[in-house]
């Protein structure tokens, strides 16, 4: 067979016939991929448009939330400076005063400027409900008074309170809770396949690269539409793949981490399990002392969010962002603190990564939010960890 092919290729007519047969096979295969790509586009196109529009709006979610909630989130400028803030433990006590008994505080978003309220995310779980309620509480940092509350997920209600929570729920779950988040994650996987099939269809089989990389001027509307789709699809393919891959990670983190763990088992994301050491006669030190302990060791950057210990062996977690000297793509440092001794247990930042899996997972949020390219074009987005606060668990 190989000898016959060699003879065919040595003959000019044989070469032409072989090339024609090969091109015919490639075109038939391309037609199949075109069908797959077209159907995937029809099925997912509308939802992808929703994800794109809501994601663009959420780039400015903080400014939007401030503007729409004066007096609740954006406060009157009565006093300047964090030195006038009430102790964080007082803030926590004020927030707890309006929460039900079974509330579980998730994250506490520290004011990003002097005129913004603390924002608490908490869940209420009942014995007979698979999906918990998710609510926000806002507290004035100067007076430790609750300025407002709102429901993100509430039993008996389809829509959340407020424009920003609505955008978040629509963006990652299509307003369908945990089930919607899984469905959107699966859509992300299928969309990745759609992008890859699009690249297969785009590939110029006859070597006409200029036609594949440019838009023909003065073309018919049909040809213009084809060229725009084909050309912009190629030039944005890497961006689309990065956004889709990171989106799958955020919606399906447990499934996403399985191959990462197989390829990089020593990643701290899988091995770190900091725990406090309870002892008789010792009580938790409180969030103020935990925060002070972290700031003594790491004074640079600004406090981003805080988390309280869960259970007797739980730890305080404190996030500091915009830390000078760290990676320009990921300038956050997360520190865990023993709730009884105040000892710093772990530090997670770009300087402490131990394996490729850590870097890969840490890159997911900068890629999705656009922070990875902010040096070239300033981009905005949620701080690390905060995006999960708008979803049920």
Tell me what each language-model feature is.
Residues 2-393:
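Conserved histidines in hydrophobic membrane contexts and catalytic metal-binding motifs
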């Amino acid at each position: 067979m190989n000898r016959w092919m060699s003879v065919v290729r040595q003959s000019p007519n044989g070469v032409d016939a072989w090339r024609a047969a090969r091109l015919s096979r490639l075109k038939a295969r391309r037609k199949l991929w075109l069908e797959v790509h077209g159907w995937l586009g029809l099925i997912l196109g509308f939802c992808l448009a929703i994800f794109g529009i809501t994601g663009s709006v959420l780039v400015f979610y903080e400014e939007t939330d401030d503007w729409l909630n004066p007096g609740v989130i954006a406060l009157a400028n009565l006093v300047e400076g964090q030195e006038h803030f009430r102790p964080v433990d007082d803030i926590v006590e004020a927030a707890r005063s309006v929460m039900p008994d079974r509330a579980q505080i998730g994250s506490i978003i520290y004011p990003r400027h002097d005129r913004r309220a603390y924002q608490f995310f908490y869940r209420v779980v009942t014995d007979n409900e698979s999906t918990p309620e998710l609510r926000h509480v806002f507290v004035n940092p100067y007076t430790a008074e609750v300025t407002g509350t709102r429901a993100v997920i509430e039993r008996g209600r389809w829509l959340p309170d407020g424009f920003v929570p609505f955008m978040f729920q629509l963006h990652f779950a299509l307003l369908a809770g945990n089930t919607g988040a899984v469905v959107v994650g699966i859509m992300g996987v299928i969309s990745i396949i759609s992008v890859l099939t699009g690249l297969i269809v785009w590939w110029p089989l006859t070597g006409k690269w200029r036609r594949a990389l440019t838009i023909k001027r003065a073309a018919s509307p049909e040809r213009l539409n084809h060229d725009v789709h084909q050309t912009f699809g190629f030039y944005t393919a890497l961006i689309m793949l990065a956004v889709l891959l990171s989106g799958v990670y955020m919606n399906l983190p447990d499934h996403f981490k399985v191959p990462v763990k197989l390829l990089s088992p020593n990643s701290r994301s899988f091995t770190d399990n900091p725990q406090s050491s309870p002892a008789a006669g010792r009580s938790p030190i409180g969030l103020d002392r935990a925060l002070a302990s972290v700031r003594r060791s790491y004074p640079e950057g600004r406090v981003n969010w805080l988390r309280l210990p869960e259970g007797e062996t739980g730890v305080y977690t404190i996030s500091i962002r915009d830390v000078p000297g760290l990676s320009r793509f990921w300038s956050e440092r997360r520190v865990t603190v023993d709730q009884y001794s105040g000892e710093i247990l772990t530090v997670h930042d770009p300087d402490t990564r131990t394996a490729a899996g850590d870097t890969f997972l840490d890159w997911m949020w900068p890629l999705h939010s656009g922070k990875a390219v902010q040096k070239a074009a300033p981009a905005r987005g949620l701080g690390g960890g905060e995006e999960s606060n708008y979803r049920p668990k």
